[in-house]
Amino acid sequence: MSFASETKKELTNLEVKDCCINAELSALIRMNGALSFTNRHLVLDVQTENAAIARRIYTLLKKQYDVSVELLVRKKMRLKKNNVYIVRFSENAKAILEDLKILGENFVFERSISKELVKKRCCKRSYMRGAFLAGGSVNNPETSSYHLEIFSLYKEHNDSLCDLLNEFQLNSKTLERKKGYITYLKEAEKITEFLNVIGAHNSLLRFEDVRIVRDMRNSVNRLVNCETANLNKTIGASLRQVENIKYIDERIGLEALPEKLREIAQLRIDYQEVTLKELGEMVASGKISKSGINHRLRKLDEIAEQLRTGQTVTLK
């Protein structure tokens, strides 16, 4: 089961306050519902591929309105042949849709979220939960990028949903897609805050656990890469220094060098793997700083370059 599916399963098991039922139902029915007329009666079908969500819609409708509700199961014939669950009711359908602020006067479809429906903060949370159940998805935290989105068919609903999320400082944004619009979150911290707001606390903990391990692994990898780069740089410099010292030895002999340079040259030949700091601690005449060692080695590089190019060699 995907992380998104596990999150939705957790949400369908939450208790909902009486004052919040309409908010959650409104989101679920608005985003997954379809109206039709059968024998001059208005029929509403709410469709989902998630059995737990279908049961929740069925339960909330029965609890809030005590109407006759059917729960149908169909098999998809294309692509993945998953079950499709349809919650169907016609009894008082128009009155229920008006109560849920989906239909207005004169059978006008309300495309934005009603302010009256989400007056209380708990009702705002419930609407967001219903919207996520109806059209939401979230990436597994183990994947390469963090992403949570909720799909809406209408721009007005998408914009009002984005505004609702941002009342909780979630920094949500909107984007037009081919067949609708999405409200989305890209920051890991905001995704965990959203999961907290809608009550998916177990999913939040799992998300955070995976994120912490992933971020720690990335930090370790960055540190290792940095150390490797530094080590490669050190090895490269050491090999260059040894090559230059050997070239000097072949051309004029190390004996021709001043004592200070000759001493460092011999140490570098003998201890090619050590750092400049360690090299400085090996000087017989007394400890030399890292910068002092570096200065002398650069002087040896300079002498080697002068020998290669036929310039006048400066030994001091």
UniProtKB/Swiss-Prot annotation:
One of its GO terms (cellular component) is cytoplasm. It is found in: Cytoplasm, Nucleoid. Involved in cell division and chromosome segregation. May influence the activity of FtsZ. Binds DNA, but does not seem to function as a transcription factor. It comes from Bacillus subtilis (strain 168). Induction: Constitutively expressed throughout the growth phase. GO terms for molecular function: DNA binding. This is Probable cell division protein WhiA. Pfam families: HTH_WhiA (PF02650), LAGLIDADG_WhiA (PF14527), WhiA_N (PF10298).
